[in-house]
Amino acid sequence: MMKRVVVDHFGGPEVLRIVEEDDPRPGPGEVRVKVLAAGVSYTDAMLRAGSYLGVPNPPFTPGYELIGVVEELGPGCARLRVGDRVGALTVWGADAERVCLPEAGAVEVPEDLDPAEVLNLVFIYMTAYQLLHRTAKVKPGEAVLVHGAAGRVGTAVLELGRVAGLRLYGTCSARDRAAVERLGAVAIDYRNEDFVARVRALPGEGVDVVLDGLGGALSLRSFRALRPGGRLVVFGHYATLAHGRKSWRGWIEWYAATGGVAAWGLLSPHRQVFAYRIQKLRDRRQVLPVGSGPGALPVGGGPRNPEWYREDFQALLELLRADKIHPVVAERLPLSEARRAHELLEQSASIGKLVLIP
């Protein structure tokens, strides 16, 4: 028997409950994994609220990523062995004691590393790494502005950006200014400063790259912060949430603003707009521009490369071993406290990763 978290209907943290049921059996090409650590992220809050693109209908189990140990192989599995430690980007389903997942979607994890620490690499640091290197294709010396710089993805971007030799700028609250500056970025107080005016005062009148994980009207202003040749990467839609629940007004505003900035990208001969979703690269599909002037290609087109996620994960492991990145684990909570983890997430009561330990 095993336990898992279930969302019976969309809503706030109060909709989460624990159920007990028989262990799952892996199907063809699947492995069953005993979960050692499962992450809690804002994407989980969006899944729970019903505002995530492609969210399944309830009931379902949240949980975007996991670290675990292979317990059983389904028919046709050849790469992994029982006892192997693996990480996986599940999108949903990780908040359980045991999970069946495709063998092809699991990446090997060294056994000597802390599972909760490595969990940061599966989603948070992977997102940051691919935003910089797979999507924006940054070069040393370029200026990069990241919104929400004190958040989980934001701090990962700043760490990886420093390794890449970038000039970094980050929007944050006054309370988080010192934390952002410690990571080597110029902090911009989004409540009291106009970030567009700040970066357009720089030599070159703007930044080379803006990373926008909020979306909505912010994306329109972010486009204006680009210098000629600049790239805007939109990778989230947290503006569609209000108090932890789906906001229809937020959705309407997000789609209107995103459509507007996409049109600007299509019409601009000198600036590009990209949309990034980590599943696109996990599932071997290159992210291409929404618009970059004449001949722009649609998102999701382009060549397939089945090794990108695995290659990038290995690069992150090397940086972790070299002590060049420092993932933070905010709290480790038992699976039974999933509701509390979501409450902490929405209160912004923690800096670092919230981890469930089944």
Model segments located where?
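A glycine-/small-residue-rich N-terminal strand-loop-strand element
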Residues: 67-91
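Short helix-loop-beta connector
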Residues: 81, 111-114, 137-143
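A structural motif shared across PLP-dependent enzymes of the aminotransferase-like
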Residues: 90-103
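Glycine-rich phosphate-binding loop and adjacent beta-alpha segment
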Residues: 217-322
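C-terminal capping/lid region of NAD(P)-dependent oxidoreductase domains
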Residues: 298, 317-332, 339-358
